[in-house]
């Protein structure tokens, strides 16, 4: 568990302000829900924490500024499940969830026994073990949602962001 600190985080797309300056500290183990109407900036805030959107202000995990980290280091601290994940139909469930262990090209080693064990355990916890060898394109919508969640959980990041999963 880690502390997440947001200091004057703001997001804009051109002249359109998506997130007004926002500050908060979320303690280890605390659960927080962002509630608001469409266009209120909930997804933009989550995407900025995940490092997918440029933002003003500071985002820190346990005192470390996320903006100072390389993508790989950030992924070890923050896992993100987007509203509409890209799911390749021709990849197996196991290989897709393995990407959560090593989410950036150049770091993926499907030969790691530890990574494969974590993926197998994660799939079992979500009752997806029997789906491991299947292609993602053969799964139902609900099964695919659970696989996307498994990928994020397999990262074993202390912070998990769920954008309307």
For the regions a language model picked out, list residue spans one by one.
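Conserved ABC ATPase "signature" region
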Residues: 113-131, 156
